[in-house]
Regions:
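Short, contiguous pre-domain boundary segments
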Residues: 1-3, 70
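Long hydrophobic alpha-helices with heptad-repeat/coiled-coil character
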Residues: 7, 105-106
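Helix-adjacent hinge/juxtasegments
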Residues: 60, 64-104
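Active-site rim elements
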Residues: 4-10, 80-81
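Short, contiguous alpha-helical
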Residues: 8-71, 111-165
Length: 165
């Protein structure tokens, strides 16, 4: 891995953690993917699909581009392998945005609302952490040890840290 700006690692972790969780869950049986837990978004599959679809939307706000067709929505069920591919593509494109865009640039969103590139990036990371935590809660509440998707797990998996949980 080449030298990176600090925000690059935050965004790379975001993508890595989502893809790692999707790949882990792709090996689970369909019944497990329909499990949920109190206080979470919904089913395990639905939570992961919502997470990836939202990241598509954040990228579309930032660039006008839609990666992965069609846009992943709550109403259609998408295979976890497709979600992982879309998450990877979206994450790579977000890194390009960070390298070239102005974080103070204002973006028209919807219903006349505006935000900056920086705030949209902050929301992308927050939203990802929130729903990955919900997905790992669903797994744990149903007796399944989730994969380690923390920052420490990212560091170990990429060989840039030896820190433990």
């Amino acid at each position: 891995m080449s030298a990176a700006q600090p925000l690059d690692h935050v965004l790379r972790h975001n993508t890595w953690a989502t893809v790692t969780l999707l790949e882990f869950c792709a090996a689970l049986d369909p019944v497990t993917l329909e499990m949920s837990a109190v206080g979470t978004y919904g089913t395990l599959h639905g939570t992961l699909q919502h997470l990836v679809g939202a990241e598509q939307w954040y990228l579309q706000l930032l660039t006008g581009d839609l990666l992965g067709r069609p846009r992943i929505r709550r109403t259609d069920s998408h295979p976890l392998t497709e979600l992982a591919m879309t998450a990877s593509l979206t994450g790579a494109r977000v890194l390009e945005v960070v390298a070239t865009d102005d974080v103070t640039r204002r973006i028209e969103m919807n219903e006349g609302r505006r935000s900056t590139v920086g705030v949209i990036l902050a929301q992308l990371v927050h939203h990802g952490n929130e729903h990955r935590a919900q997905a790992t809660t669903i797994l744990g509440a149903n007796g399944i040890e989730p994969p380690p998707v923390s920052g420490w797990g990212y560091g170990r998996a990429t060989g840039i840290s030896e820190a433990e949980e």
